Curated annotation (Swiss-Prot):
More about this protein: This protein may be expected to contain an N-terminal transit peptide but none has been predicted.
Pathway(s): Protein modification; protein lipoylation via endogenous pathway; protein N(6)-(lipoyl)lysine from octanoyl-[acyl-carrier-protein]: step 2/2
A Gene Ontology cellular-component term: mitochondrion
Top-rank EC class of the record's enzyme: transferase
Protein name stated in the entry: Lipoyl synthase, mitochondrial
């Protein structure tokens, strides 16, 4: 049994007022919510209780998770189950494409669990999902939020060949905390993945980090420098929230002013888009990042 599931951390601090969100409303949200419930569509927006769900759905954007809901990794920040994943569903690409068509999604974000149990690490299903979406939804733009595929270029090439408008891979945290937060991942390997994607012709690359895990300001700024050095175009910076008592605790709630400071620094470094705020998640304002 891994340490993430065994540890029980101290009681959580109450959330500050700037982390409170209004319940989602609006015609677009209501219609999409009805479709998701009726057809049991698998969006991480709903299953992950994302605070921005109403806003994103109102803009015609949604995020879908493929390759099941059990991950082979046990990252200390992540609420996705860890264990032995189920058999690959080879009909999944068509199912996701149909969901996008039913929901009339203008911009779709696709993400997945890590599948280190598979020889191709899930990259074939990834590519087939993009192809199916393109066939069934020719006007829908795409972002693929990919795992590191252990840095295997053959698997990365499968993503590159289907040419999503945006390819993202999250650093998640600063270099010093990577081993504690991401466990099986490596900071430099993630940077190598992002460099490779850009070098092989991906037009827009993107990455994201969470704050509140004990990082220092200078470490956050260093991540921003490292991402720019890797020619990353877009960065998202948000507040880490503890999914359960068994996950890493929140060390600090970052103030709105500090998020604004990081946004200013990111823009000065030359990122095309910087999304920085307590409620920002990887897919926040994703539809704007294709430009």
């Amino acid at each position: 049994m891994n340490t993430v599931t065994e540890n029980v951390f101290p009681p959580r601090e109450p959330k500050p007022k700037w982390l409170r969100v209004k319940l989602p409303t609006g015609k677009n949200y209501t219609e999409l919510r009805g479709l998701v419930d009726k057809y049991k569509l698998n969006t991480i927006c709903a299953s992950g209780s994302c605070p921005n769900m109403g806003e994103c759905w109102g803009e015609g954007t949604a995020t879908f998770m493929i390759l099941g809901n059990i991950c082979t990794r046990s990252c200390g920040f992540c609420g996705v189950k860890t264990g032995r994943p189920e058999t690959v569903d080879w009909d999944e690409p068509e199912k996701v494409a149909r969901s996008i068509k039913l929901m009339k999604i203008k911009h779709a974000v696709i993400t997945s669990v890590d599948r280190d149990d598979l020889k191709d690490m899930g990259s074939i299903i990834w590519a087939e999902t993009v192809k199916a979406i393109r066939r069934m939804n020719p006007n829908t733009t795409l972002e693929t939020l990919i795992p590191d595929f252990q840095g295997n270029t053959r698997n990365l090439d499968r993503i590159i060949e289907v040419a999503p408008e945006v390819v993202s891979h999250n650093m998640e945290t600063v270099k010093r905390l990577t081993r504690e937060v991401r466990i099986q991942a490596k900071y430099e390997k993630s940077l190598e993945v992002l460099r490779y994607l850009k070098a092989q012709g991906i037009k827009r690359t993107k990455s994201g980090i969470m704050l509140g895990l004990g990082e220092k300001e200078e470490e956050v700024i260093q991540v921003l420098h490292d991402l720019r050095d890797a020619n990353v175009d877009i960065v998202t910076i948000g507040q880490y929230l503890q999914p359960s008592k068994k996950h890493l605790p929140v060390k600090e709630y970052i103030s709105p002013e500090q998020f604004e400071k990081y946004e200013k620094i990111g823009k000065e470094l030359g990122f095309r888009h910087v999304e920085s705020g307590a409620l920002v998640r990887s897919s926040y304002h994703a539809e704007k990042h294709i430009h």
